[in-house]
Amino acid sequence: MGYDVSRFQGDVDEDLICPICSGVLEEPVQAPHCEHAFCNACITQWFSQQQTCPVDRSVVTVAHLRPVPRIMRNMLSKLQITCDNAVFGCTTIVRLDNLMSHLSDCEHNPKRPVTCEQGCGLEMPKDEVPNHNCIKHLRSVVQQQQIRIGELEKTAAESKHQLSEQKRDIQLLKAYMRAIRSANPNLQNLEETIEYNEILEWVNSLQPARVTRWGGMISTPDAVLQAVIKRSLVESGCPASIVNEIIENAHERNWPQGLATLETRQMNRRYYENYVAKRIPGKQAVVVMACENQHMGEDMVLEPGLVMIFAHGVEEI
């Protein structure tokens, strides 16, 4: 529906009047053949009854409608109109194209969002403030939270039960696999080959790395840092069969003899450049896999590999 003509300052050109509602055009559209203009809502409602132009009865449908010319839109935008909230005391007169932005900030707008200043902080339409009850609102919030907590507790209990069942199934599956392997040695060899190929595929997917500051090595990473590195290993595609073992080898207590203490590391530092290292994506850390470092002595590598974490100095080659 169009704007009430009485809200506008001065005379309004008759070309800007909707023939259906007799108001000033709101969201105007035009029938292209006869060039008659209508409010979008008015003509849409009209077409629900008949498919003709309301003015000259020529055949026209919703699909035929087009936006009105720019000159007409400019004429509409320049009209001066009173605020929708004039009945509530607003005396502002604005250009039609600024009406919506004014309404959103108009202090007389009964639907303007306001925040309760009595303590609950609820945002509500201004006209609902007189009937607002903080205690009632907060009670509703608490009840909703209790319902949500109950749902989360139920979900957590179900997840815990499912996890317990899955752990039991995994143990049964492991026992079954052990029985099969013991009965068929060839199957065990095949499984080991598949696992080795999976490890090689993952290692080859990582970027070669160079360590420029071996002195920045963190040989005793805490549990939090190890968890961060482990997450990156998993995200990089590290096979599940070795990820835990590799991350355990991120601490010097599990390192081979040649890396076990600061003294031995300093003695063997000249050999570090011979390592084939791969960068753990996004981290100042490398993985040194035994399958790529068979040229190193047994006192410098671990099966299946080890992780070295640094404060800085890890670069991709």
Curated annotation (Swiss-Prot):
SUPFAM superfamilies linked to this entry: NRDP1 C-terminal domain-like, RING/U-box, TRAF domain-like
Entries under InterPro entries matching the protein: NRDP1, NRDP1_C, Znf_RING, Znf_RING/FYVE/PHD, Znf_RING_CS
Listed transmembrane segments: none
Functional pathway: Protein modification; protein ubiquitination
Pfam families: USP8_interact, zf-C3HC4_2
Domain of life: Eukaryota
EC number of this enzyme: 2.3.2.27
ZnF (RING-type) ranges: 18-57
Record's keyword terms, sorted: Coiled coil, Metal-binding, Transferase, Ubl conjugation pathway, Zinc, Zinc-finger
Catalyzed chemical reaction(s): S-ubiquitinyl-[E2 ubiquitin-conjugating enzyme]-L-cysteine + [acceptor protein]-L-lysine = [E2 ubiquitin-conjugating enzyme]-L-cysteine + N(6)-ubiquitinyl-[acceptor protein]-L-lysine
Coiled coil: 135-175
Signal peptide annotation: none
The UniProt record lists the keyword DNA-binding: no
Biological role: Acts as E3 ubiquitin-protein ligase and regulates the degradation of target proteins.
GO biological process assignments: extrinsic apoptotic signaling pathway; protein polyubiquitination; regulation of canonical NF-kappaB signal transduction
Enzyme type, top EC level: transferase
Name of the protein described by the UniProt record: E3 ubiquitin-protein ligase NRDP1
PANTHER family: RECEPTOR-ASSOCIATED FACTOR, PUTATIVE-RELATED, TNF RECEPTOR ASSOCIATED FACTOR
SMART domains: RING
GO molecular function, one term: ubiquitin-protein transferase activity
